[in-house]
Amino acid sequence: MHDQSTARLHQDPFAPSRRQFVAAAAAAASAMTVALPASAQQAQPKIKLGVVGCGGRGAWIARLFKNHGAYDIHALADYFPDVANAAGDALGVDKSRRFSSLSGYKKLIESGVDAVALETPPYFFPEHARAAVDAGLHVYMAKPVAVDVPGCLAIEAAARKAATNKKCFLVDYQIPTDPFNIEALNRARDGGLGRLFVVHSHYFGGQFPDPPKTATIESRLRFLTWCNDVALGGGYHVNACIHSIHGGLLLVGKTPAAATGFSSIRRDNPHGDSHDAFSISFQFADGLVWNHLARHGNGLFAPEQVFSGCEFLADPAFLRIGYGGRTILRGGPKQYAGGDVQNLYEAGAVRNIATFHKNVTEAAADTTTVRLAIDSCLMTILAREACLRADKITWDQLLKENKTLSADLSGLKT
């Protein structure tokens, strides 16, 4: 089963081939401006967009869509009416197209949108994505795509159906859009790295509020509190470390055979069940070693480090890419001095928004971001489970178990 899972990277209709990666990279590198000139805004067809999840990042990315100039923010949905209304006021969305409660996304889908942007806690992504694709819409979604294996498989099925129906499905990762990362990865793929021995990834980000739980999980659905809850957000490793894991897969291009690791909860007064300190080793069938280290706390790290990055140690070269800091390919036949990755959180989203518009309006039916988004999610789930069990877990075992995580939605407004 593992060999089949690895092979599908090169067989799936929505898996990125090398040619597609280069084309996507060129498109991302050209999408560098926040807003289109007025003349270009008038020339480009507008996409009617619905945004599901209008809290911090949802409202923020909705503004980026609006600033692009060729999106009409047509409808909004959020569990909390005050959140939907605040975003609606800021974005000029008619009050009749602001929806709330758990089922608000259904009304948004029926409101006449062409596409949806999904920005809720990841627990809800599979259900929302499936409904959007079934309705014939294009999908733009945040990461991680799910919190468990069944959710990942549901996203895989939805993306496959989107491809069949000639619709776009884009998962918003930022590291692959940076010009320095793109060039360094292309050189490495073209023989510039040599024989890869070890991959080292890390994530040294902060924590999110983790207050005492209330009678229902309603209080966990805002202010990123859900990052502390494995069922709602996947936990810190799946939700955050996935940036670095996804970055590594951009070059490695295959999933591990197994993972082992140790993790614990180190934050003060925790109420969610997510661990926040991780040391993980991934084993690959060809002998490749990949280690990952993470601390989800509010302390410092070395001045030369960036909070999220990935290093590739090969013979003869060394490659570093990341969410910030200096990207470099050192040694080997295709050395690259690279440069500092700047403002990637916003710049990467802006590039992806531009790429999504281009794909939708040109009927490109592009779904090439999906394969690595699913495999990076499965890889982080594999690591999370190995750490929780303090045992080695194989990729095949994880898929065979097909474990479902359930959040208690009782008492919530439906």
Where in the sequence are the language-model features?
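N-terminal secretory signal peptides and thylakoid transit peptides that target proteins
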Residues: 4-28
